[in-house]
Amino acid sequence: MSARGSGEKPSIVVLHSINFEESWTKQTYLDIERKFGEEGFTVKAIPLQIPGIRTMEGFQEKRTMILERVPVPPTLVVCIGDPSWLVARPLFDKEWKDIPSIICYARDYMYPKEEYLIDLDKNVLDTLVPITDVVKGYNATFIKYPVYIKQTIELIKKLQPELTKLAFIFDRRYISQQTKADVEAVLRKDFPGIQFEPLSTTSISTENLLDRLASFDNKTGVLYYSWYRTRKDNENRYLVDNVQKMTNSFSVPPIFTLQDVQTENGNFAGGYYVSPEDYAQVTVNT
């Protein structure tokens, strides 16, 4: 890689769709910072908090903020989560034209336009298109993050032989909605005898989620994906901020996950997924 502009130090901008607090995405940033920092790159992290945006003007404000923090076009842009790439796409049409970008934690499908990120009343599966179509014409590479749903459910069945129902914890973000649909599809195909119970931020409060978990017995498997809520949701912030710690305390059956959410701290029982360290290595070597 070479810096754009004579004498400019090469730089990498890491855009995060939300923030860098989750261990499975924080590791990617830390490895990029370590590896490329040693090679003389300046690495800048910019969290975008996209789920909190409710207007198109909000997206433009984020782009203005990005350009203020990165006045000189970077050498490379790493987008953690494809929503961050969608928000930055107008920059790749103008200020950052032809600059290479890498989309991390990508799936096969994504939204074609940023407005879908705020118009969540639409049917998610009807609006998603192949990621290859969205990035066509741009100097963009994407690294998929596999989700091992079938293997994780098989693990739950092995540890809970009386399993008759699977409760799935997720939020309003489209990646969560897409994963929920994938879980339902796997249950229909491979586990037709297991009932499905969705537990979503769109239908219950955090307090009610914890109450529901407390009512389960070992016939119910619990699979956690995400529980992101903005401050605009008027929720009990202590419960929201500590939901990952509290779910295990309230739930009788163990709680499994499809991605690493620091299972070593005892809040989750585990599952089948790619470790943050392994995924980060793939990213920095791309």
Question: Where are the predicted features?
Answer:
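Short hydrophobic alpha-helices and adjacent helix-cap/hinge residues
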Residues: S2-T286
